[in-house]
Amino acid sequence: MADLLAIKARGVGERIVALAAAGTPVVGICGGFQILGREVRDPHGLEGAVGGALPGLGLLPVTNVLELEKTLTRATARHAASGLTVRGYEIHHGQLEGDGWEPGIVRADGATVGVSARGGAVWGTYLHGIFDDDVFRRWFIDGLRVRRGLAPLGRPVAVYDLEQAFDRLAETVRANIDLQAVLRLVGLA
């Protein structure tokens, strides 16, 4: 709730709302998701006075209620707009309330962990790490590219050859560090 107060006090909240009204895509992860909703309620005083509530930015038709039990789990879910399976983790006290939302991201067990509005231009999720997935990230960035009049790339451009990267790192260390001196300093030689 402190983050919500801070962005409102600095005028950032108004700017986010104005950008969304102009059609700019807006995404919120976890606390950002809660901020995008209608209201954040704190009936147990986890982040403020017991029974406290703050109006959110009103961009998503949800209320987040902070519950005593914290959700802490890895999750696999389906992102509705892209049709892609996404993975990440949840770490939050929030529980969704509301109606009229588009369930944008749904876990395998049927729980909604992400909501979208304005035709998918505004969305939020409890799922941390969603952009770590190369295919999902490419889908999202391609959508932004199309909005700017650029052609989508259509495929992830990241290449991860960890073995080769570790070999290069090891060679660089061997070439530039006196390992025997380091071992002597730490008492291992």
Could you describe each region identified by the protein language model?
Residues 17, 21, 62-189:
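Amide-donor transfer/coupling interface in amidating biosynthetic enzymes
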